[in-house]
Amino acid sequence: MKISGFSFGRNTSKLYYPIKESILSILPICDEFIFVLGKGDDDDNTLEILESIDSPKLKIIHTEWDTEKYPNGTENAHQTDIAISHCTGDWLFYVQADEVVHEKYLDLIKSRCQELLTNDAVEGLLFKYRHFFGDYN
């Protein structure tokens, strides 16, 4: 069984997304992690953050965003599709740039993926999650 993690983003450091924490939260159970990186602004250092992960599992795919061709947020779906097209796993785990998976669930996630791998009635797994809101004030 092979698990592919994936995500996408651009200007994630400028927007204060915890991209490194997000990837590292699921990386232990992934055989590969695909990150589709859109060309960001000159002062964005998302690539450096990704490279600091220093894992052979992490594959960075560089892209250009075309918001004229994909307007009103549909570029996000387009970038997601690009990431999916590079995944080679039996299971694909989508973690967005502002999401993390608690480490106490990693073994359970992996074991359920293994258990359900050949069950054709299962198309995906659903997770309960919590939202945290806050600011710097």
What do the predicted segments below correspond to?
Residues 31:
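Receiver (REC) domain switch/active-site residues of two-component response regulators
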Residues 45, 95-112:
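Acidic donor-binding/catalytic loop of UDP-sugar-dependent glycosyltransferases
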Residues 34-36:
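Ligand-binding pocket scaffold of soluble enzyme catalytic domains
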Residues 3-6, 10, 18-21, 38-94:
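Active-site-proximal specificity loops/subdomain of glycosyltransferases
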Residues 121-137:
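Short beta-strand-to-loop element that shapes/binds the nucleotide-sugar donor at the catalytic cleft/hinge
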Residues 27:
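Gly/Ala-rich phosphate-binding loop of Rossmann-like dinucleotide-binding domains
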Residues 11-14, 99-102, 132:
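Short acidic, S/G/P-rich loop/turn micro-motifs used as interaction or catalytic elements
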Residues 113-119:
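Basic phosphate/pyrophosphate-binding loop/patch that engages nucleotide-derived ligands
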